[in-house]
């Protein structure tokens, strides 16, 4: 892990101090988005009005090359430092995906909290309703709750009857300076059409549906490459063992290298608060075929930046111990209401993959439109700008409140 600890910034009392508490031991959209933000030019170079300090619990995954020091609160001195930051009137503390944590509830109950931001990115899908009082307490303690999508905000509002004006949407952004060179792939009838999936091999991702779809595509010059690992890996490999058109390559360190080697990304999710992988595909000009569920349509506009398939089938998946449970509800993006989770019909998915494999011009159209959308809106600079505006807003309001109290 690279470490860049700017001691001069610590000494400058004019800087707005922001402490981040985020889990960095796992692999997911929360971690990738945070690392890209904290390593961005806006944070490291351009914007000298902030001092950022990072806290975590446990180890940092080797995939994340952070350019700032990370403080593990398993060490007592670091835990005490975080507590002092939380109780300070002069510092903002930003928690990521901790809205449903019992430990956080206890933590906040015991401490006076002044400038806390909670960033919710999807864990509430599986939060039982009986824990609503705890959720309300945590939101009450916070100055603001940020969500990564309108779908996440809707889940808070519809499932838990949260109508707080504290909830605000800031869509994720990615580093658009990353080089992602798409392979020059052949489109003649004899060439193989490469499709891919990348992500955790767990219940919400719906990979079992994609494998079943490939059963209908045997002999069609279409091959699926699955990148990722997880608790369902053994069972998915068992499901796919008789299909020579499917290969598993395990977890990849560089998702852009993987994306640049395929012609179509398939996202068959059962639950997906936003879908960061769609943004990464867009940067690489890789078209996306995805489930029309939750926050995915906030990135993929059907027939414009990709294609969406409605999830209509009852879910049939083996659930080993330790797998992420299915949520009680997901967000229907068409009517903005909650519905029982469903999966894509495998035969319908197979037909759509086959259809798109025969339309390279259409895929190119989707890819260019998605690329433009990512470059224009879903970029890390826009994300940073909106987030820093929130920090300044809280800093201004806390200064006014402090003067009134005095």
Model-derived features: positions:
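N-terminal strand-loop element at the rim of the active site
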Residues: 2-7, 16-79, 230, 390
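Conserved donor-binding/catalytic core segment of Leloir-type glycosyltransferases
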Residues: 18-21, 187-205, 210-214, 337
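A conserved mid-protein helix/loop that constitutes part of the nucleotide-sugar donor-binding site
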Residues: 28-36, 197-216, 231-234
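A conserved, positively charged/aromatic
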Residues: 87, 117-146, 154, 161-162
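Carbohydrate-associated surface elements
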Residues: 151, 173
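Aromatic "clamp/platform" in nucleotide-sugar-dependent glycosyltransferases that forms part
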Residues: 251, 270
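Short hydrophobic beta-strand element within catalytic cores of glycosyltransferases
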Residues: 287-290, 300, 307-309
């Amino acid at each position: 892990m690279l470490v860049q600890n700017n001691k001069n910034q610590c000494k400058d009392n004019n800087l707005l101090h922001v402490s981040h508490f985020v889990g960095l031991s796992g692999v997911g959209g929360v971690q990738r988005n945070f690392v890209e933000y904290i390593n961005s030019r806006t944070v490291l170079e351009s914007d000298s009005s902030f001092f950022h300090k990072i806290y975590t619990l446990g180890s940092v995954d080797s995939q994340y090359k952070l350019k700032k020091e990370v403080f593990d609160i398993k060490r007592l001195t670091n835990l005490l430092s975080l507590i002092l930051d939380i109780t300070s009137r002069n510092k903002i503390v930003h928690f990521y995906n901790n809205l449903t944590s019992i430990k956080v509830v206890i933590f906040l109950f015991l401490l006076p909290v002044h400038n806390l931001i909670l960033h919710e990115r999807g864990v509430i899908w599986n939060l039982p309703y009986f824990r609503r009082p705890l959720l309300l307490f945590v939101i009450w303690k916070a100055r603001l709750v940020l969500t990564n999508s309108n779908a996440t905000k809707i889940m808070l509002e519809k499932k838990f009857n949260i109508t707080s004006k504290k909830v605000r949407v800031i869509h994720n952004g990615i580093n658009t300076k990353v080089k992602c060179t798409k392979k020059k792939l052949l489109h003649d009838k004899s060439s193989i059409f490469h499709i891919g999936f990348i992500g955790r091999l767990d219940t919400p991702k719906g990979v079992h549906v994609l494998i079943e779809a490939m059963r209908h595509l045997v002999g069609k010059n279409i091959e699926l490459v699955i990148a990722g690992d997880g608790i369902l890996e053994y069972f998915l490999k068992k499901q796919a063992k008789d299909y020579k058109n499917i290969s598993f390559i395990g977890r990849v360190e560089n998702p852009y290298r993987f994306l640049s080697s395929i012609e179509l990304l398939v996202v068959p999710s059962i639950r997906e608060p936003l879908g960061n992988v769609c943004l990464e595909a867009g940067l690489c000009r890789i078209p996306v075929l995805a489930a029309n569920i939750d926050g995915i349509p906030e990135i993929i506009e059907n027939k414009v930046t990709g294609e969406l398939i409605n999830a209509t089938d009852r879910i049939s998946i083996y659930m080993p111990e330790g797998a992420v449970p299915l949520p009680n509800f997901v967000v229907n993006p068409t009517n903005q209401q909650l519905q029982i989770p469903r999966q894509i019909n495998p035969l319908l998915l197979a037909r759509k993959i086959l259809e798109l494999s025969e339309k390279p011009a259409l895929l190119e159209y989707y890819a260019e439109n998605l690329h433009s959308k990512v470059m224009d809106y879903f970029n890390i600079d826009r994300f940073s700008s909106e987030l820093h505006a929130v920090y300044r807003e809280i800093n201004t309001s806390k200064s006014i409140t402090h003067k009134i109290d005095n």
